[in-house]
Amino acid sequence: MGKDYYCILGIEKGASDEDIKKAYRKQALKFHPDKNKSPQAEEKFKEVAEAYEVLSDPKKREIYDQFGEEGLKGGAGGTDGQGGTFRYTFHGDPHATFAAFFGGSNPFEIFFGRRMGGGRDSEEMEIDGDPFSAFGFSMNGYPRDRNSVGPSRLKQDPPVIHELRVSLEEIYSGCTKRMKISRKRLNADGRSYRSEDKILTIEIKKGWKEGTKITFPREGDETPNSIPADIVFIIKDKDHPKFKRDGSNIIYTAKISLREALCGCSINVPTLDGRNIPMSVNDIVKPGMRRRIIGYGLPFPKNPDQRGDLLIEFEVSFPDTISSSSKEVLRKHLPAS
């Protein structure tokens, strides 16, 4: 059974955006490892960050409410708005979420690095109110501009696009791709960086079309003043030695001689699964002529149990020279027009 993000934050399913922010603020301060020394604090801190990232994003929250954690992370929520598959993967760094929530600063040092007035320890603060006002932070955790009423807003960096080349055989059968990316991650202080490698796993579904987009939200470089970019992979077909692709159909070009084009022939048509299908051609092969073998193409993306067709085009090879006697025979037997 998947994680209950609402339970992790201690809120009801119908909680407002402000309730979610308030709950994250409370839980993050409670379980921050620099404050909470229990063995479970680090894992709880990470769970709280993941829950906040999902529930504070309208699209992720909608998918989670419908399909749960497995649907959110497995791509059950449909497209990303650009024709690609939306799937969520937590970036794994709760300290980056903590720093981003507070606008790239580290209020943790302010709260827990000194005692409050009157000898009251900061760990005892009531964090359901507005504990940030005295330190220049607004209720949602962003730095407060003293000359403005509302909080500043972080902008997300543009998506980082990569091409992902796949063979027709991989599209035919489906496959798993593991893509290694390198990115910058913020340290806990919210200012310095470290380099990090991560493996992103992509499940290539049967029949996916060229141009399909797979989006990993917020997996790009972290900076103090912006939201990490989405990493986007776009499916591109590899060139194939035998076939061309036409949607869910595939095209095979059969090379035959002029004699075979006029008198008929038998050919073996290869398939994507490694078989050969014998085909007799008894008609005269004319320019643009095609034959069709139904159901031997690629799976349909939305119904992979059904497949497109295998189309056979013909390329007629003409002789470079022909004898005078052969020309005479052709003149006698071939129509003039």
Curated annotation (Swiss-Prot):
Keywords: Cell membrane, Chaperone, Cytoplasm, Disease variant, Membrane, Phosphoprotein, Stress response. The modification Phosphoserine is found at S122, S148. Coiled coil: none annotated. This is DnaJ homolog subfamily B member 4. Transmembrane segments: none annotated. The keyword Transcription does not apply. It holds the Pfam family DnaJ. It comes from the Eukaryota. InterPro entries: DnaJ_C, DnaJ_domain, DnaJ_domain_CS, DnaJ_subfamily_B, HSP40/DnaJ_pept-bd, J_dom_sf. SMART domains: DnaJ. Probable chaperone. Stimulates ATP hydrolysis and the folding of unfolded proteins mediated by HSPA1A/B (in vitro). It comes from Homo sapiens (Human). Induction: By heat shock. One of its GO terms (biological process) is chaperone cofactor-dependent protein refolding. Changing L262S: In CMYO21; severely decreased protein abundance in homozygous patient cells; increased degradation. Expressed in heart, pancreas and skeletal muscle, and to a lesser extent in brain, placenta and liver. Residues 2-70 form the J domain. It is linked to Congenital myopathy 21 with early respiratory failure: An autosomal recessive muscle disorder characterized by diaphragmatic weakness, respiratory impairment, and spinal rigidity. Disease onset ranges from early childhood to adulthood and severity is variable. Death from respiratory failure may occur in severe cases. Some affected individuals may show developmental delay and hypertrophic cardiomyopathy. Homodimer. The C-terminal section interacts with the C-terminal tail of OPRM1. Also interacts with SDIM1. GO terms for cellular component: cytosol; nucleoplasm; plasma membrane; Z disc. The keyword Cytoplasm applies. It is found in: Cytoplasm; Cell membrane; Cytoplasm, Myofibril, Sarcomere, Z line. GO terms for molecular function: ATPase activator activity; protein-folding chaperone binding; unfolded protein binding.
